[in-house]
A protein has these predicted regions:
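Low-complexity, intrinsically disordered short peptide segments enriched in small/polar/basic residues
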Residues: 3-6, 26, 35, 49
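Positively charged, low-complexity intrinsically disordered regions
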Residues: 6, 20, 27, 58-59
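A short, charged, amphipathic alpha-helix used as a generic interaction element across diverse proteins
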Residues: 11-14, 22-45
C-alpha cells in the first residue's frame, strides 16, 4: 500500500497536512503525484510513503 500526503498551499495553515490519498500500487501513486507536483512549490509538494511491515516509510525519491 502507498499514500501521498498532500499539504495546504496557502493561508494561515500553509504547509500543514491537508489530507492523505491511498493507493494499492506504486504506479497509481506515481500518476497522482505527477498530477499534483509543481516545481515552484518546493517543499509544499506531496510526499510519498510506502507501508512496509505495518509501518509507513517515506520514499526519498519523491
Amino acid at each position: 500500500m502507498f499514500k501521498l500526503r498532500i499539504y495546504k498551499l496557502s493561508g494561515a495553515y500553509k504547509g500543514n497536512l491537508d489530507h492523505e490519498e491511498f493507493f494499492s500500487t506504486r504506479e497509481e501513486m506515481e500518476t497522482r503525484y505527477n498530477e499534483l507536483f509543481v516545481y515552484e512549490n518546493y517543499s509544499l509538494n506531496p510526499t510519498a510513503w510506502e507501508n512496509v511491515g505495518g509501518q509507513w516509510k517515506r520514499l526519498e525519491e519523491f
